[in-house]
């Protein structure tokens, strides 16, 4: 794939011609390895491997011809469902390669002036660390997941991203043909990871393009708007210092407009949060409803739910955020007297829910529903060192993700559950008791695999900061300071697991019977 990618990087970047990629034999082998469903049965995996190995130029050409002629149902339904899933995986991988090439050219300075970022979770954490001096209200928007398939094709044609007519025609045939899959095995096709990734990929491009046009409107209406784009920092794993901006002098009649348009906006998946003044929130409630209604060509605003949060109830990506007034007192001395004054500023204080993490650990098999540690039976086939390594890696992932929380001291409970579950797993494997295992492995495990969080965090930060910041790190108290260790791409499954459960009662989603996105709500 590397050689093929290097040879065709110029074609992908300039000519936008993706149709020949679908006739490469190794292309489907790569797609099958990337998008294979780990929960599929052994028979399904063997059938997928057989179909993947038997793919050739004539097989793909014959299958594409049947898709366009609507004759796929003539053969056995199980075989064709797997073949259609492989075609969807090939389409997804082709689009992924194309946009990855465009993103690389944009970061290197060779691309255009506008590029979409599909890994925007880095900007969310930098956004959560900002202060909101004029913001007192928040608005939550649930974007509908229903998109007509022709809007995807029209999007590519209007933006001139892909000029390959054959590729777009095949994509249109695939998406429009899904309503006719009455004889095929829909369960295998809809649950294939390649199809879900294809639909999610197209949906994310569509919504991101709508947001880019929305930001352009904000720039026209808002004077002196500072829109910070964190897309170019997508490859970094930490933010060590905020950018210092030189504020120009503001005239008296311009201060009100600056306060009025001061807002914070962030989106992850189908859920977005807007924080601003109460007047701004009321105006944007009307604006968002009509904006997404016209973008999705809805006759009515069904499927779009706008909810105004209270000041202490903002839930996003596994965190619960609340505002807290940070007061700074000043003593102003006059010629004959002095008086006290204060400066009030709103700050984000993120917290994580212990109950949500307990549910996640119970699903993973570390504890029961009540939080009591149990042995993880799926790890009994590994060696003791592998069990320690897996448990330690899982703990570090949780600590990376929640080290910026206000209540990160509660992570000691999670650490205790993982540690005791590890002991029970080893005791069950050796048919021994927990007391014997703790006497034998307790000191070694705590010394090697569970170091103190402060020392571990300090070593982690010092290894990644520049030399001039190491002295500063040795002076601050890391037990009270919040740090975002933005190694987020490796723990992306946490956001998918908890993002679905949060605010389930506040949002409603209408999915039609013949909708092309039946699995999108389960995936997000």
From Swiss-Prot:
Q: Which Pfam families match?
A: Intron_maturas2 (PF01348), MatK_N (PF01824)
Gene Ontology annotations for the cellular component aspect, listed alphabetically: chloroplast
Among InterPro entries, the record links this protein to: Domain_X, Maturase_MatK, Maturase_MatK_N
One of the entry's Gene Ontology molecular-function terms is: RNA binding
**Gene Ontology terms: biological process:** mRNA processing; RNA splicing; tRNA processing
Keywords, ordered alphabetically: Chloroplast, mRNA processing, Plastid, RNA-binding, tRNA processing
Which locations, inside or outside the cell, does it occupy?
Answer: Plastid, Chloroplast
Q: What is its main location?
A: plastid
Its biological function? Usually encoded in the trnK tRNA gene intron. Probably assists in splicing its own and other chloroplast group II introns.
Please give the family membership noted in the entry: Belongs to the intron maturase 2 family. MatK subfamily.
**Stored HAMAP family:** MatK
User: In its UniProt entry, what is this protein called?
Assistant: Maturase K
**Highest lineage ranks of the organism?**
Eukaryota, Viridiplantae, Streptophyta, Embryophyta, Tracheophyta
């Amino acid at each position: 794939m590397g050689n093929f990618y290097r040879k065709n990087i110029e074609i992908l970047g300039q000519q936008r011609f993706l149709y020949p990629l679908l006739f490469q034999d190794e292309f489907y082998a790569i797609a099958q390895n990337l998008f294979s469903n780990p929960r599929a049965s052994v028979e399904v995996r063997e059938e997928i491997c057989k179909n993947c190995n038997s793919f050739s130029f004539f097989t793909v050409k014959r299958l594409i011809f049947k898709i366009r002629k609507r004759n796929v149902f003539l053969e056995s339904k199980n075989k064709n469902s797997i073949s259609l899933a492989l075609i969807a995986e090939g389409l997804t991988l082709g689009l992924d390669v194309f946009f990855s090439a465009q993103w690389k050219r944009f970061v290197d300075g060779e691309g255009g002036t506008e590029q979409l970022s599909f890994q925007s979770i880095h900007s969310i954490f930098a956004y959560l660390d900002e202060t909101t001096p004029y913001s007192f209200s928040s608005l939550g928007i649930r974007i509908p997941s229903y998109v007509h398939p022709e809007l995807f094709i029209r999007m590519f044609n209007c933006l001139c991203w892909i000029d390959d007519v054959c590729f777009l025609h095949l994509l249109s045939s695939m998406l429009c043909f899904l309503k006719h899959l009455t004889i095929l095995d829909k369960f295998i096709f809809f649950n294939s990871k390649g199809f879900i990734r294809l639909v999610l990929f197209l949906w994310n491009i569509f919504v991101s393009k709508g947001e880019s046009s929305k930001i352009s409107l904000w720039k026209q209406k808002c004077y002196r708007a500072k829109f910070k784009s964190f897309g170019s920092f997508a490859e970094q794993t930490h933010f060590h210092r905020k950018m210092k901006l030189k504020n120009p002098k503001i005239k008296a009649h311009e201060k009100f407009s600056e306060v009025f348009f001061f807002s914070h906006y962030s989106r992850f998946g189908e859920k977005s949060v807007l924080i601003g003044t109460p007047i701004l929130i009321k105006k944007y409630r009307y604006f968002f409803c009509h904006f997404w209604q016209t973008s999705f060509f809805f006759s009515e605003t069904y499927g779009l739910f706008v909810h105004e949060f209270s000041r202490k109830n903002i839930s996003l990506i596994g965190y619960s955020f609340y505002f807290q007034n940070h007061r700074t007192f000043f003593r102003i001395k006059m010629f004959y007297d002095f008086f006290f004054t204060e400066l009030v500023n709103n700050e984000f204080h993120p917290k994580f829910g212990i109950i949500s993490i307990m549910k996640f650990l119970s699903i993973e098999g570390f504890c029961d529903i009540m939080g009591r540690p149990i042995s993880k039976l799926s790890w009994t086939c590994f060696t003791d060192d592998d069990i320690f390594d897996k448990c330690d890696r899982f703990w570090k992932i949780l600590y990376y993700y929640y080290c910026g929380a206000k209540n990160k001291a509660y992570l000691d409970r999670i650490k205790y559950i993982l540690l005791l579950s590890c002991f029970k797993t080893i005791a069950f494997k050796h048919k021994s008791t927990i007391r014997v295992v703790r006497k034998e492995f307790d000191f070694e495990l705590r010394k090697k695999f569970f170091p103190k969080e402060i020392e571990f965090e300090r070593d982690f930060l010092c290894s990644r900061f520049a030399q001039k910041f190491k002295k500063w790190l040795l002076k601050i108290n890391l037990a009270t300071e919040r740090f975002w260790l933005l190694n987020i791409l490796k723990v992306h499954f946490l956001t998918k697991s908890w993002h679905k459960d949060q605010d389930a009662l506040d949002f409603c989603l209408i999915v039609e019977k013949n909708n092309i996105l039946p699995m999108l709500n389960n995936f997000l």
